[in-house]
UniProtKB/Swiss-Prot annotation:
Gene Ontology annotations of biological process type: negative regulation of canonical Wnt signaling pathway; positive regulation of tumor necrosis factor production; protein localization to plasma membrane
Residues recorded with modification Phosphoserine: S24, S383, S387, S408, S439, S446
Gene name of the encoded protein: FRMD8
Disordered as annotated region, ranges: 1-22, 376-408
Protein name: FERM domain-containing protein 8
Pfam families: FERM_M (PF00373), KRIT1_FRMD8_FERM_C (PF24522)
Amino acid sequence: MDGTEGSAGQPGPAERSHRSSVSSVGARAADVLVYLADDTVVPLAVENLPSLSAHELHRAVREVLQLPDIALDVFALWLVSPLLEVQLKPKHQPYKLGRQWPELLLRFTSAPDDDVAMDEPFLQFRRNVFFPKRRELQIHDEEVLRLLYEEAKGNVLAARYPCDVEDCEALGALVCRVQLGPYQPGRPAACDLREKLDSFLPAHLCKRGQSLFAALRGRGARAGPGEQGLLNAYRQVQEVSSDGGCEAALGTHYRAYLLKCHELPFYGCAFFHGEVDKPAQGFLHRGGRKPVSVAISLEGVHVIDSREKHVLLGLRFQELSWDHTSPEEEEPILWLEFDGDSEGTPVNKLLKIYSKQAELMSSLIEYCIELSQAAEPAGPQDSATGSPSDPSSSLAPVQRPKLRRQGSVVSSRIQHLSTIDYVEDGKGIRRVKPKRTTSFFSRQLSLGQGSYTVVQPGDSLEQG
């Protein structure tokens, strides 16, 4: 499993995948099915499947879809099931990994034996975790943009990417534009929206959408705040005149959708399953645990509440130290250390994430940091490689403001976490943020001046 990146959830038996990526195997030839993010199937006839590498299958998919060379970097092959998701390295052999799937599930998930026996992975062609967002802004091929759009849309609708209502409305409006065309008051397509509202908004926002349809049909009914926001956003989607006609216009809307998703800190992340301790609610009442998703990208780590669909903690790599432990007969733990305060006193905080994927998460953090450091000197040069004559290049702003709404689902909620707070025993706290005076772990992002210094802490840790 060296170098693979994955994520896992714990669905019920009803959610089992019935897909398979090998439809038939002969003496030499095999029919392989590769799925796209929109559930489209790419059938491939290949020979010598057991020894075929992910790189060779990737090339075959690109040829069938007639994708440009940039797709080699943008997309990767994944082995996916409801229990585990693994991005494959080019050298990996998907067929052999598929045969080893039960062993991977036992090692990296807590799924019951019956679920492990029934689970079957399928091959999916989707975004490469290691592809930088800044390079994504330079893509102008419409089919590549469409594939990225479909994947991002699926993550938004499934609430894998938690979004504020305002962002759901803006993104849903762009989906309306792509699927229904330019907004026209009273057009017959409004009835299509009634039947396909979950194609535009996450499920938890669709429950209160009944008044939207009458408003779209012009019957005078007042839509609720969320529904009215979607309707207003649909009206305001800008149309861009282009010599390329309809296809060029769709490419503009795909790009606009991706640009909006880039504002979400967990766009393009790999997702992992874990649990964290809840804060104790009383002297004799233990808090228990809550399930979380851990989203890791080239930029940092986000811990997301799996049930409430909001961010609990968001850290850039410059803001954390980390390690993982796998004690015998105990659960593996990913440790995240970051600066905080306790009743106004600066402290170091330790967060424990219980997960059988702690090893995968730790390895991915380390590799993402290595890639970021290696790419940093080339940043300004890469940003200048876009074609200045391309009018769509002006749609990519150099820098976008971060979301800072009060109560935003992407804002950290550290108060909902149970952490261990500590300072160096026997010494006063002397530091100027963000520089750390004490570090429990030695694994950090080193950026030279201004990076954290490693000082051994005292022996005793104080429970926060």
